């Protein structure tokens, strides 16, 4: 992940030099952010971001129920409200039915035995989010409103994607999600990032599938280690043991041409930047302004500070 920022922008970090948490400017990390030769056991990065918490979001009435959308993005027909599933994964179909979609048509492929299910009303709902048109192929993607939905809704969306196009490596506590869609690859990473989990991505050249179909597109495999249960309905994809949270390291710095930036300040002191939601520190511009004002016009300004926003707001309410 890349973040454009000023050299004096501050970051809340874990400093491995001092084995403690700290707030440090970007330019202060550049001289000694790593030691040892790369790709050796002695190589290490010294500055790491804070652990990321889940993005709360809010419960929404979504055009397509999250699990069904995830299942369709994984195993659905691009131009119809169809899902393709094997007989052993019939639980996925039952889960879609529980979202309110009845089976309109059902067929079984004579060679592979894969079952085809068309659901009544699914295509109409998918068209509300700009997908599933019969006259042209759409770009499968996760609509923006789903990224800010509630935690439970985003979990259901993730479960639908993993039940269809995911695989579980239980010994490594890791899920792999595979797709040939470039945008869906990016959207999946963004979705996983809303839970504070980091991903790794690998690319694989087209190959012959287990069903005998020759692939024609590059396959993207996104891997991540969750720290809590994901509500998958396929039994073999239900993870029982979980990884501990891991910090993200600063692994490189590059000077770029100056560009327009904005100072941001939020109540909590830390906000998330970039598509991968990297924790970063508040702007200190307001503090500098108040200091300047008190120094230059002490006769017209007064400042009240407190360790609690409720106390501070209460004080000004009484005034």
Roles of regions detected by a PLM:
Residues 227-257:
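Surface-exposed, non-catalytic interaction/assembly patches
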Residues 183, 188-189, 216-219, 226-227:
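Terminal recognition/anchoring or ligand-binding modules at protein termini
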Residues 1-208, 246-282:
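Intein-associated homing endonuclease modules of the LAGLIDADG/DOD-type, together
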Residues 97, 118-120, 220-222, 226-232:
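C-terminal extracytoplasmic interaction modules
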Residues 95, 187, 191, 220-221, ...:
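Alpha-helical scaffold elements adjacent to nucleotide-binding pockets in ATP/GTP-utilizing enzyme cores
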Residues 283-319:
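Phosphate/NTP-binding elements of NTP-utilizing enzymes
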Residues 99, 237-238, 319:
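Short secondary-structure boundary/capping segments
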Residues 201-224:
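Beta-rich nucleic-acid/ligand-interaction surfaces
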């Amino acid at each position: 992940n890349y973040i454009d920022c000023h050299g004096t922008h501050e970051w809340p970090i874990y400093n491995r030099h001092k084995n403690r948490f700290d707030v440090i400017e970007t330019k202060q990390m550049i001289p000694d952010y790593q030691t040892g030769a790369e790709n050796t056991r002695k190589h290490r990065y010294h500055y790491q971001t804070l652990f990321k918490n889940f993005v709360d979001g809010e419960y929404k009435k979504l055009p397509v129920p999250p699990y069904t959308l995830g299942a369709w993005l994984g195993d659905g027909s691009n131009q119809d409200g169809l899902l393709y599933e094997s007989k052993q994964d019939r639980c996925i179909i039952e889960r879609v039915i529980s979202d309110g979609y009845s089976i309109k048509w059902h067929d079984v492929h004579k060679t592979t035995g894969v079952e085809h299910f068309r659901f009544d009303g699914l295509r109409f709902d998918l068209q509300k989010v700009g997908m599933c048109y019969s006259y042209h192929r759409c770009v499968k993607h996760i609509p923006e409103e789903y990224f800010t939905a509630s935690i439970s809704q985003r979990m259901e969306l993730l479960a639908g994607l993993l039940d269809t196009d995911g695989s579980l490596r239980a010994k490594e506590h890791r899920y792999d999600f595979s797709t040939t869609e470039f945008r869906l690859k990016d959207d999946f990473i963004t979705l996983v990032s809303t839970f504070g989990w980091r991903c790794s991505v690998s690319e694989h050249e087209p190959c012959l599938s287990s069903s005998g179909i020759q692939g024609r597109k590059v396959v993207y495999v996104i891997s991540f280690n969750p720290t809590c249960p994901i509500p998958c309905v396929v039994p073999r994809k239900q993870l029982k043991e979980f990884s501990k949270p891991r910090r993200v390291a600063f692994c490189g710095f590059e000077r770029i041409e100056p560009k327009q930036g904005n100072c941001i300040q939020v109540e909590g002191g830390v906000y998330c930047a970039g598509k991968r939601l990297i924790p970063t520190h508040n702007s200190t511009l307001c503090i500098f302004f108040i200091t300047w004002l008190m120094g230059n016009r002490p006769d017209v300004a007064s400042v009240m500070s407190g360790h609690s926003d409720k106390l501070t707001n209460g004080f000004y309410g009484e005034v």
